[in-house]
Curated annotation (Swiss-Prot):
Molecular-function GO term, any one: ATP binding
Organism: Parvibaculum lavamentivorans (strain DS-1 / DSM 13023 / NCIMB 13966)
Protein name: Protein RecA
Main location as per UniProt: cytoplasm
Known role: Can catalyze the hydrolysis of ATP in the presence of single-stranded DNA, the ATP-dependent uptake of single-stranded DNA by duplex DNA, and the ATP-dependent hybridization of homologous single-stranded DNAs. It interacts with LexA causing its activation and leading to its autocatalytic cleavage.
Domain of life: Bacteria
Length: 365
């Protein structure tokens, strides 16, 4: 019996020696840190994040924002708030001293609106490339530099391959953009992780032709981005915010369709006000009510037995005028983030957009 135990220990020690030899050989060949034990350095497990500018969305994402060193996809219909959400993330990154870049493939960035959202234009790197290849090459160079914290590419649909630009107007080039994206993401994904750069791809929605069952909606650029993205956000405009007869903002719903760093399928709603961006005060009222921090009785809202307004808009205005109370409510909401996360859990289900072959025919939404 003891003989078997001794031989087992011997086998284990031989296995350990063989493993140590293999690890040292890998480190000699590919450099120190190319392979390591996951639990040895706990900082490796920690995922750094950048706030989205929305308190509710930060809670829904599970790590306090969008993860750094990962690929993010934000998609939705036109005028749903995709670029606004990306610019708010850029503004939050700049507040903490981050370097941000914006690859404007659509040639549609409004610098005045970006400034209103809090983006420091003097520190923002911007590129307006002519072709999809040029845009992705610029993105690759910026990521490899290791000096950029957040890189936004707006949008995947506007990354037109050079062959398509040089061809005739009616030429059929199926799958060309999908192949371009697939090759670029294979090249980018390793350097994104090493440089700890967050790359946000903004994408548009198309309708698949001839779909009888399920949603006909899909995103442009093939399937590669769906696989490589660690977080996918589906953003929709669900209503208008009016001041008397004038529309002053949009009610917006964001669903976390995919999340590799925390449980997915949570969804949040917030207001995007024109010329202001995501309404922080509106979120404090809504999330505070869900967590029981802000009491609601009829149409009246109150905090610590003090009435703060009749109706949601009046409560928002009261918090704008009383920043100390707003800060107190925000701190209480952050302390109860786990409870709120449970309340905003959506019904689990698969991604609504079906798989898209490289050569699928697409029609504009």
């Amino acid at each position: 019996m003891s003989k078997n135990v001794v031989s087992l220990v011997k086998d284990d020690s031989d296995k350990k020696k063989a493993l140590d030899a293999a690890l040292s050989q890998i480190e000699r060949s590919f450099g120190k840190g190319s392979i390591m034990r996951l639990g040895k350095n706990e900082q490796i497990v920690e995922i750094e994040s950048v706030s989205t500018g929305s308190l509710g969305l930060d809670i829904a994402l599970g790590i306090g924002g969008l993860p750094r060193g990962r690929i993010i996809e934000i998609y939705g219909p036109e005028s749903s708030g995709k670029t606004t959400l990306a610019l708010q993330t850029v503004a939050e990154a700049q507040k903490s001293g981050g370097v941000c870049a914006f690859v404007d493939a659509e040639h549609a960035l409004d610098p005045i609106y970006a400034r209103k959202l809090g983006v420091q234009l003097d520190d923002l790197l911007i590129s307006q490339p002519d072709t999809g290849e040029q845009a992705l090459e610029i993105a690759d160079t910026l990521v490899r530099s290791g000096a950029v914290d957040v890189l936004v590419i707006d949008s995947v649909a506007a990354l037109t391959p050079k062959a398509e630009l040089e061809g005739e107007m009616g030429d059929s080039l199926p799958g060309l953009q999908a192949r371009l994206m697939s090759q670029a993401l294979r090249k980018l994904t390793g350097s994104i992780s090493k440089s700890n750069t967050m790359v946000i791809f903004i994408n548009q929605i198309r309708m698949k032709i001839g779909v009888m069952f399920g949603s006909p909606e899909t995103t442009t650029g093939g399937n590669a981005l769906k696989f490589y993205a660690s977080v996918r956000l589906d953003i929709r405009r669900i209503g208008a915010i009016k001041d008397r007869d004038e529309v002053v903002g949009n009610q917006t719903r964001v669903k976390v369709v995919k999340n590799k760093v925390a449980p997915p399928f949570k969804q949040v709603e917030f207001d995007i006000m024109y010329g202001e961006g995501i309404s922080k005060m509106g979120e404090l009222v809504d999330l505070g009510s869900k967590a029981g921090i802000v009491e609601k009785s009829g149409s009246w809202f109150s905090y610590n037995s003090q009435r703060i307004g009749q109706g949601r808009e009046n409560a928002k205005q009261f918090l704008r005028d009383n920043p100390e109370m707003a800060a107190e409510i925000e701190a209480a909401i952050r302390a109860n983030a786990g409870l709120i996360a449970e309340k905003i859990m959506d019904v689990p289900g698969s991604e609504r957009d079906g798989d898209e072959d490289a050569g699928d025919m697409e029609a504009s939404a």
